[in-house]
C-alpha cells in the first residue's frame, strides 16, 4: 500500500529561493516502525496467517507457507521421572 506524499508544489521564500512544500519533505511512512509492524500483524491476523513471534521466521521454512502448525511452540507436559525410581 502506498502512502500519499502530498503535492510537490514549490513554495517561494524571500531571496528568490524555492523550497519544497512541507508536506513533501516527510518520511515515506507516516507511522513509526512499531506501529507499522502492528498494522501488518493485525492484517495477517485477519487473513488467518498470524505468526505470534518473529523468532518463528527462522525456525520454519518458507515453503510451508500458511500450512504451519504451531504445536511445537506449546511444550506438552511430560511425566517426571525420578532418578531413584526403577523405571
Curated annotation (Swiss-Prot):
Membrane topology, from the record: Single-pass membrane protein
Residue spans crossing the bilayer: 48-70
Localization annotation: Host membrane
Name by which UniProt lists this protein: Uncharacterized gene 86 protein
GO cellular component, one term: membrane
Source domain of life: Viruses
Gene: MDV086
The entry's keywords: Host membrane, Membrane, Transmembrane, Transmembrane helix
Keyword Transmembrane helix set for record: yes
Primary residence: host cell
Amino acid at each position: 500500500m502506498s502512502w500519499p506524499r502530498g503535492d510537490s508544489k514549490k513554495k517561494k521564500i524571500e531571496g528568490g529561493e524555492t523550497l519544497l512544500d512541507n508536506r513533501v519533505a516527510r518520511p515515506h511512512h507516516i507511522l513509526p516502525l512499531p506501529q507499522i509492524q502492528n498494522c501488518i500483524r493485525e492484517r495477517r491476523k485477519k487473513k488467518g496467517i498470524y505468526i505470534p513471534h518473529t523468532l518463528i521466521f527462522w525456525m520454519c521454512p518458507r515453503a510451508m507457507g500458511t500450512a504451519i502448525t504451531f504445536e511445537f511452540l506449546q511444550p506438552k507436559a511430560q511425566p517426571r521421572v525420578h532418578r531413584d525410581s526403577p523405571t
